[in-house]
Structure formats: C-alpha cells, structure tokens
A protein has these predicted regions:
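Extracytoplasmic gate region of multi-pass secondary transporters
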Residues: 76-77, 260-304, 308
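Central cavity-lining transmembrane alpha-helices of secondary-active solute carriers
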Residues: 96-114, 304-316
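Helix-to-loop junctions at the C-terminal end of transmembrane segments
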Residues: 108-121, 313-325, 409
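C-terminal ends and interior cores of transmembrane alpha-helices
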Residues: 130-147, 336-348
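Intracellular juxtamembrane helix-capping segments at the cytosolic ends
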Residues: 166-179, 366-379
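Glycine-rich segments within core transmembrane alpha-helices of 12-TM secondary carriers
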Residues: 185-203, 388-401
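Helix-loop-helix hairpin linking two adjacent transmembrane segments in secondary transporters
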Residues: 189-240
Length: 450
C-alpha cells in the first residue's frame, strides 16, 4: 500500500514508480479485504493487462471450491450405517443430520445476502473453506472425545454446513465477476465440478473402504479435509474482481425485489432444484432393480450415474456454449426432463426406467447454472443479494421436490412412479415460466431472450 511519503513501492504484487511526478494528496485509508481486492482490480485494469489470463487461477480455485461443497454434502451420508453400528445411534437421529445440513445451508443462503457485501468475497470464501475443513476434521475427532457421540457428529455437521452454504453463495458470483467473453459457458463448467466431485467422493470413498476397511473412515475424513485447507490457501492470493464495478450502481434489496424478472428467476430456480432432486433420490432403487445388484451397491451406483450424466450435460455446454442458445437449451432440457419422468413413471421395464434416470440427470444439468447466468445478464446490478436468494430458491426446490413426490406416492399406496409423475409439475412450470419471460422481454425491450 502507499504511505504518506510514497515510500512503499508495491501494490498487488507490482512494482510502482513515477510518484514524484504525480500530484496526489496524501491521505490515510482503512484497507479491508474488499477494498484491497477492488484496488487490485482497478490497478490491473488501468495497466491494461489481460484479464482472462490473470483470472484463470481464480476460476480454477472456484472449480475446486465446488468439489469441496460436494465433499461436505456427500461424504458423511456414506457413513450413516457405520455411525449406527459404531456409536449405537438410532437411524432416526442419523437421518436428522441431512435435515440439519441442508436446513442450516438454507439459513446461510438467506443471511449471506446481508453480510457478504460488507466483509467482501475473499474473506467470505476463506471462512467457507475454514468451516468446511473444521467440520471434516472434527467429525474424525469429536464423536470419540464427547460423552454423547451424536453431539460430536451434530457439531461437525453444523460446522461444515456453514462452509457448504457459504460456498454455494460466493463461488458462483466470484466466477461471474471474472472478465470472460462467455460467462454462461464458464458457469456451466463450474457447476459440472459439483457433479464430478459427487461422483469422485462416492467412487474414491468406496474404493478406500474396500481396500483399507470401513473402520479407517476417520483417516479418509482427514484426507478429504485437506482439500478445503489447500484450496482455501489459494484464495489468499488469487485475484478477485468486484461483482459490480465502481462505475455501476448496484441494486438495493428493495430495488431488487421490485424487479419482476427477479421473481421469475426465483421460480425457475426453485423448479430447477425440484426437477433435479425429485428423481435423483429414487435413482438407487431403479439401479438395484435393473441390474439385480444389492442395495448397498445400488445406493452408490444410482447417485453416481445421475451425477455423471448431469456433469456431462454441464461440461458439454461449458465446451460448446457459444454455439448454443441458452434459452432454447433450457426449454429443451425442461422438455427432456418431462420425457424422462414419463419414462420412469409409465415403463414396465426396469432397463427403460434406468435409462429414464440417466436422461433425467442429463436433462437437469444446465437448469441451475443457466438460471444463474441468465439472471446475472438480465438483472444488472443484482449483486450478492440476487445470487443468495437464487441459491435459497434452488435449495427450497431441492428440499420440496422430493417431499412433494413422496407425499403423493404415500397417498397412492406408496406408488413411487405416481409420485414421480406428479413431480412433472416442476419441469412443466419451469418451461412455461421461461416462455413467458421470453415473450415479456421481447415485448418490453424488443430484444431476444438470450
């Protein structure tokens, strides 16, 4: 930073010279992570540096950030049966951990709209990685240290849920802020890493348990904890661009909620989350029946197949997105999702049902990241609050979709196929909302909807 006598010669890692000829009134400023990031961004912009090259490291760190989120969401559920036998914890209490994890993430989604802009993205993403690492480390230590093993697991889940919730809110806008010609492609590729992370956690953990034994799960927990630790350290150095440039006026929360498009995107996001999870949770059952494998293997293969297909969908758009119209892609994906639901609901063949599960995973891939990109393009100055509430809407859909499908199935004699058929209301609502917003944009602005 610069001192009053201009003796400091370095800003953001660059040598500075020529201050003797500059007429600058010395002043004392308070530097925070947020102001320092903005200073670095504006200084590099003044130098005319290549922003694409400079921000590759930032984007890579964000990709790994989504792998961290996949770790905290998917590793511990693999240990539920182990917790039940090792610590004599009732299964009813163990399944409560899922509700705690995603419930706290919902709270973080909402709360982050009010504090992230105040502390800045760098500090926020560092805190997210810290809590994720602490949660994974503590789950290997606290259950044996505390008299009540469940409380040790409970505290650990609370810790990594804070990290997971923050990561979901901050990583996407950090990538969105990076100067890039095709931000929708990058956003889709970013979200594909959650899918690869999910598949990787399941496959690597399964291999570890089979080679070294399930009793050594604590060692693996510490290995997974190294990922947020190492990636968190990279966020100390990578450049972070401001989501809203200084010359732009960001929308206040009151101004944001007055935007009709904002509410449309919230509905789309909620439907995207519901469409993704309504079938995802039943993937294991269809895989077990179609392939004639055990439940334990099916519980691993089903979610992996779904995640891999979803990741492939996002990676394809991430690679060829500049040749694909996002609006048409999302409408097509919604229609494909409806078709996959019908395959699962009406087919008497387990193989066709399995194909329907795979098609469902592929179809929902673009919906979540596509909504992020479209909202950012359409609502200028939406900022952190917009991303936070979009994440909240998506998580509400993820929780509500399977619940709705399960309730309908229960009312019809535990007929899961009919529950999934009823869940077609989510992709259908998504399609209708997309079309209405497209027509609305054309009539107001005489421009194409993406």
């Amino acid at each position: 930073m610069l001192y009053e006598d201009n003796t400091e010669k370095e800003v953001c890692g660059y040598e500075i010279s020529g201050f003797d000829n500059m007429k600058v009134e010395p002043q004392t400023v308070t530097v925070t992570y947020k102001s320092y990031d903005n200073l670095c961004y504006n200084y590099k912009k003044l130098r005319g540096e290549s922003m694409k090259v400079n921000y590759n490291s930032t984007i890579r760190s964000c990709f790994i950030g989504y792998i961290v989120q996949a770790i905290v969401n998917n590793f511990v559920p693999l240990l539920f049966i182990t917790f039940q036998s090792q610590y004599s914890i009732p299964l009813s209490k163990i399944t409560l951990l899922i509700t705690i994890n995603f419930g706290l993430q919902l709270i973080i989604d909402f709360a982050s709209a009010f504090f992230i802009d105040k502390i800045g993205y760098r500090l926020s993403v560092l805190i997210a990685h810290l809590f994720a690492a602490l949660g994974l480390i503590s789950i290997a230590i606290l259950p044996d240290m505390m008299n009540d093993s469940f409380m040790g697991i409970f505290i650990s889940v609370l810790l990594y849920a804070v990290g997971g919730g923050l990561l979901e809110v901050v990583v996407s806008p950090i990538v969105e802020a990076c100067p890039n010609e095709h931000k929708d492609k990058t956003m889709s590729m970013l979200h594909s890493f959650y899918c690869w992370g999910t598949a990787g956690v399941v496959v690597i953990s399964t291999i570890f348990f089979n080679v070294f034994g399930i009793d050594n799960w604590k060692i693996l927990a510490l290995v997974w904890a190294a990922v947020p630790v190492i990636n968190g350290l990279t966020f100390l150095k990578v450049p972070i661009a401001p989501l809203i440039n200084e010359e732009e006026n960001g929308l206040s929360l009151k101004e944001l909620i007055k935007q009709k498009a904002f509410w449309g995107f919230l509905l789309i996001m909620c439907c995207a989350g519901a469409s993704e999870q309504s079938v995802s949770q039943w993937a294991s059952a269809f895989v077990e029946k179609a392939l004639g494998i055990s439940k334990s293997i099916g519980d691993l293969v089903g979610p992996t197949v779904f995640s891999v297909l979803m990741g492939i969908s996002r990676a394809i758009y991430g690679k060829f997105g500049e040749k694909i119209n996002l609006y048409k892609m999302m409408v097509f994906s919604g229609c494909l999702c409806v078709l996959s639901y019908l395959m699962v609901s009406f087919s008497s063949s387990a193989i066709v049902g399995l194909i329907g599960i795979a098609v469902s995973g592929f179809s929902v891939g673009i919906l979540w990241p596509g909504t992020y990109s479209d909202a950012s393009t359409s609502i200028k100055g939406g900022g952190t609050a917009m991303f936070a509430f979009l994440a909240l809407a998506g998580d509400v859909g993820c929780a509500g979709g399977p619940t709705f499908a399960g309730k309908i199935a229960g009312m019809l004699g535990d007929n899961l196929k009919m529950g999934i058929l009823a869940a077609t209301v989510f992709p259908i609502t998504l399609i209708i909302t997309l079309i209405i917003m497209n027509l609305h944009k054309k009539s107001l602005y005489n421009t194409k909807y993406l």
